[in-house]
Amino acid sequence: MAAAANSGSSLPLFDCPTWAGKPPPGLHLDVVKGDKLIEKLIIDEKKYYLFGRNPDLCDFTIDHQSCSRVHAALVYHKHLKRVFLIDLNSTHGTFLGHIRLEPHKPQQIPIDSTVSFGASTRAYTLREKPQTLPSAVKGDEKMGGEDDELKGLLGLPEEETELDNLTEFNTAHNKRISTLTIEEGNLDIQRPKRKRKNSRVTFSEDDEIINPEDVDPSVGRFRNMVQTAVVPVKKKRVEGPGSLGLEESGSRRMQNFAFSGGLYGGLPPTHSEAGSQPHGIHGTALIGGLPMPYPNLAPDVDLTPVVPSAVNMNPAPNPAVYNPEAVNEPKKKKYAKEAWPGKKPTPSLLI
């Protein structure tokens, strides 16, 4: 085991001893500044870990001016099952509690002991993996309260300090897993190169008309507000050689309509009327496209005298059956029957 000096142009190196081995899972360091826990450093992956200011050579960087580039090494002894701390000839020294370690001499670090590097105020406490309680309660032991009983059943520690310690450990463990996953993924995945967008400016020779109503007078200014609706029209009847148009068939029907002759319906028209307007058959004339009847100026007179019918001034009385009960009864009013179209005749209820 040897360590190069931190001074000079040569790079500091650390030779791993033969007795170094992999530590048990869950071994970690609590980084505390004052009374506040800053983070947890998991140290169960490698045989040794380097501490110092140089982030390229050290596993854990100490950001303090009093620390050397490669300050110290933390090594796990595979036979003794203990952790040893080695000072790599640092300028301001490595401390176990308040005792400064000798350079290049391994010093055993007990569990729950605290170490510090240089003049840094951060203290590093060695911890094992937090122990969880069994899920079942042994014997007749009873928990004090409902919360403590629930924590015991879930396998969580009863005290708040132990619970916070377990939470911080799990957080640090998850961060390490996510970091390792990202680093391994970056080795296999090649990031595609970004294509630069064409930043050149081009001009189009074609003129683009935005408002056509300003150029074309046939385009209305409010064309966007106009709505067009198409209403289908019934097809007109096709006029064939054997069929008549609507207007002609209508006039034919009006001509064939039987008009009453009136007082002078049978006389022919005079010469002035015949020359001024056309007339049709049956004593009708076409006025405004419609047939109108002519008045009969000389109707036929019936010369046979009309004999009036004889009127009987003394009608014979109609015999009726005498009913003595009807005489004593009071007279009843008789109302007229109501009649309307479609009413069926019903027998009268009045006597």
Swiss-Prot record:
Its EC number is 3.1.4.-. The modification Phosphoserine is found at residues 178, 199, 204, 249. Its cofactor is Mg(2+). A motif (Nuclear localization signal 1) lies at residues 185-209. It comes from the Eukaryota. Residues 191-200, 331-337 are annotated as: Involved in PP-1 inhibition. A synthetic peptide, NIPP-1(330-351), is able to inhibit PP-1. Phosphorylation of Tyr-335 reduces PP-1 inhibition, whereas phosphorylation of Thr-346 or Ser-348 has no effect. This is Nuclear inhibitor of protein phosphatase 1. It comes from Homo sapiens (Human). The gene is PPP1R8.
